[in-house]
């Protein structure tokens, strides 16, 4: 358990812009002291839940614009409880929110379960992890260097 003396410090610098349909929703938040991702909530009308049928996907608004600091990205990831209990997960995972993107963050959900799933206003639907970005100089070569592994992939190292 984290006490105020040993709780990890939050790094300042994430600015959010609340959109009109995000009014009244809690800010994205880290639900525990050790959480890596902040939970994102559905910014749907209270009287219009969204039903995602098995095999269907839906784009769910969060009601916020995130001003991700330069040199970082926001990674949209599924919530494990929704995936395990209902088969609800995020497509394009992790989805990347670039630091220069200034539109509303939306979450692309898919229902891999057997039952319809209702997304309601304020429901925690995904999480966002803020991570540093490394950009490399890109150059073309005439051939690849040799390694012990070579071009082996897709199970080439075995399972045991």
From Swiss-Prot:
Pathway(s) annotated for this protein in UniProt: Pyrimidine metabolism; dUMP biosynthesis; dUMP from dCTP (dUTP route): step 2/2
GO molecular function, one term: dUTP diphosphatase activity
Keyword Hydrolase: yes
Function: This enzyme is involved in nucleotide metabolism: it produces dUMP, the immediate precursor of thymidine nucleotides and it decreases the intracellular concentration of dUTP so that uracil cannot be incorporated into DNA.
Enzyme class at the top of the EC tree: hydrolase
Higher taxonomy: Bacteria, Pseudomonadati, Pseudomonadota, Alphaproteobacteria, Hyphomicrobiales
Keywords, comma-separated and alphabetical: Hydrolase, Magnesium, Metal-binding, Nucleotide metabolism
Taxonomic source organism: Rhizobium meliloti (strain 1021)
CDD domains: trimeric_dUTPase
Catalytic activity: dUTP + H2O = dUMP + diphosphate + H(+)
Cofactor: Mg(2+)
Binding positions for substrate per the UniProt entry: 79-81, 92, 96-98, 106
Top-level division of the source organism's lineage: Bacteria
GO terms, biological process: dUMP biosynthetic process; dUTP catabolic process
Family: Belongs to the dUTPase family.
Matching InterPro entries: dUTPase, dUTPase-like, dUTPase-like_sf, dUTPase_trimeric
Protein name: Deoxyuridine 5'-triphosphate nucleotidohydrolase
């Amino acid at each position: 358990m984290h006490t105020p003396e040993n709780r990890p410090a939050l790094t300042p610098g994430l600015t959010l812009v609340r959109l009109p349909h995000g009014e009244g929703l809690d800010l994205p938040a880290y639900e525990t002291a050790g959480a890596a991702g902040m939970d994102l909530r559905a910014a749907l009308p209270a009287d219009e839940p969204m039903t995602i049928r098995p095999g269907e996907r839906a784009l769910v608004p969060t009601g916020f614009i995130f001003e991700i600091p330069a040199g970082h990205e926001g990674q949209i990831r599924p919530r494990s409880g929704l995936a395990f209990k209902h088969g609800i997960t995020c497509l394009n995972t992790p989805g990347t929110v670039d630091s220069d993107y200034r539109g509303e963050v939306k979450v692309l959900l898919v229902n891999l379960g057997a039952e319809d799933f209702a997304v309601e206003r304020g429901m925690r639907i995904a999480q966002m992890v803020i991570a540093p970005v490394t950009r490399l100089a890109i150059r073309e070569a005439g051939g690849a260097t040799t390694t012990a592994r070579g071009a082996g992939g897709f199970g080439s190292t075995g399972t045991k």
